[in-house]
Amino acid sequence: MKLCGFDIGLNQPFFLIAGPCVVESEQLQMDTAGTLKEITSSLGIPFIFKSSYDKANRSSGTSFRGPGMVKGLEILAKVKRELNLPLLTDVHSEADIATVASVVDVLQTPAFLCRQTDFIHAVAQSGKPVNIKKGQFLAPGDMKNVIDKARAAAREKGLNEDNFMACERGASFGYNNLVSDMRSLAIMRETNAPVVFDATHSVQLPGGQGTSSGGQREMVPVLARAAVAVGVAGLFMETHPDPAKALSDGPNAVPLKHMKALLETLLELDRVTKKNGYLENSFGA
């Protein structure tokens, strides 16, 4: 699959989607994006900057949601223009899709909306590449149905059917907890879409702090290493200069100062994993 000018897939080094969870300020976006560009450029990692203009899914009605679509897209557009970076952001309603697609390079669907057929159809018909997140409630094999819906919608409009990625972000494991079954990354290859692993939302503790979600950021490197060892096309990681002060998902954000070391480790694992292909493909049932 071609994405933002580079090739992605299991026969390519992983690409990275990274940035703060939510647009907090123009300065934070520019500084974080600039640092990530320096890191990924030095390591040769294809990079897409991400951040959300609105976090519609929050634990509490008083939680910070973001600057809104108009201001948020204005800030993201500046990042793209001044740093020459491709952008990804999530959309939560059909009404926003056209406006958002006019600014960003890649759309993302929230995990909770993966079974909303009309929404998936609308996003798929935007003409943009889409990172489709697997719901925490969904079996990995069921993502084939979701990707098939997206492809059918694109085909109906004469658009590129190979414009979709399947993203794993953990599965509900009792109350206020998620678990990552690494088999899902191999199972989701059956969609014939590039598989992306969300290493930061996978360590989230949803609603685990009463009016906000908790997280185990110390487990991000653990799960990221495991995912790369399985073999993925891309990684998704939220990062922040000071996670303790982040306005959204700070407990599961990677401290920006640690991103380079983590990515260096993951690159080495990626090379080993992809050197001789995937033995599981020849093992059979």
Swiss-Prot record:
Which one of the record's GO molecular function terms can you name? 3-deoxy-8-phosphooctulonate synthase activity
- Which GO CC annotations does the UniProt entry carry? cytoplasm
- Protein name per UniProt: 2-dehydro-3-deoxyphosphooctonate aldolase
NCBIfam families, sorted: KDO8P_synth, PRK05198.1
- The species is Polaromonas sp. (strain JS666 / ATCC BAA-500)
Its BP terms in the Gene Ontology are: keto-3-deoxy-D-manno-octulosonic acid biosynthetic process
Q: Which reaction does it catalyse?
A: D-arabinose 5-phosphate + phosphoenolpyruvate + H2O = 3-deoxy-alpha-D-manno-2-octulosonate-8-phosphate + phosphate
Superkingdom assignment: Bacteria
